Amino acid sequence: YGKSSQIRAALRLIASIQPDILALQRFDWDAELRAARAFQSALKAQGWEMQHLLAPRPNTGVATGIDIDGDGQIGGPGDAQSYGAFAGQRGLLLLSRLPFNPKTSKDHSQIHWANVPKTRSTDPPEIAKVQRLAYVAMLQTSVTWDRQSIYLLTFHASPPVFDGPEDRNGRRNADEIAYASGLIDQLPTPFVLLANTNLDPFDGEGHNAVMRQLLAHPKLQDPQPASMGGQASANLQHRGPARLDTVDWPDPRPGNLRVNYILPSRDLAVQDGGVHWPAKARPAPHANSHRLVWQDVSLP
């Protein structure tokens, strides 16, 4: 990682925030988890140790053996379960200072899109029988905190763009979020949802109402972590509050949006939170166009 200014920036930022639990998105997966363990070691060298990790195999780049994107060929990145140049590209990494409980860990990444309740899938049968719902991965687990289990649900949903009038990616994104909402119905409390839904409640492409429905889930609270940088970079044509934006995308479209969320269950006490987006960008490189969202919670 020594030659990557972006990775060095990410390590410094994480070490300065000092999270107990961290969900990293777009982290390439390998079968032996060498990259994940190297990142752990590099983070420890920065002064912040996160001893425990979970890295489910992502759907990105996983071959389906059929022509999904309709280009007349099989085996391209558009024919994978989710777009990817290789299996494991842009995966999901969960790090923690508290041990994960394997008995409560469940990977929902292999559930087929056509089989979820009230599916929006319109894929033909030959695609529907293989197409998974999760764009990257969807994982639930728990940690023990002060002798009490805290459940976690994390996922990275499809971008609701890069398609056509058929809105396939938009419909898949909506169903991923709706499926997560159904999992929350069954999830024991207390819990925390950590997700890149790729969907803003008000602005940008996608089924925005689905995001508003998730935020209004009766078991969730939305602390609305904010930043001065988001406010200072406001897109005047947007409806949503700029201070809540979490990603710095090109203007004017899509512009800055709120797509990254930490949503605790209602029985957790929210102490503090924010989005790491300084009002004035420093010359040093950003870790990512997605800003780090953080939330401090305590047991009631």
Report each predicted region and the residues it spans.
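Metal-dependent phosphoester-hydrolase catalytic domains
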Residues: 99-111, 171-192, 197-300
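Solvent-exposed loop/turn segments at secondary-structure junctions
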Residues: 27-31, 58-62, 100-101, 157-161, ...
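Extracellular polysaccharide-degrading/modifying enzymes targeting complex plant/algal/animal polysaccharides
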Residues: 64-86, 90, 96, 101-126
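Beta-strand-turn-beta hairpins that frame and shape the catalytic cleft
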Residues: 92, 97-102, 125, 132-156, ...
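Acidic/histidine-rich helix-loop elements
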Residues: 1-7, 122-126, 161-172
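N-terminal, active-site-proximal structural segment of metallo-dependent hydrolase catalytic domains
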Residues: 1-92, 148-150, 281, 298-300
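A Trp-anchored, charged/polar loop motif used as the substrate-binding/catalytic surface
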Residues: 7-8, 127-142, 175-185
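Solvent-exposed, polar/charged alpha-helical surfaces in well-ordered, non-transmembrane soluble domains
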Residues: 8, 12-16, 37, 41, ...
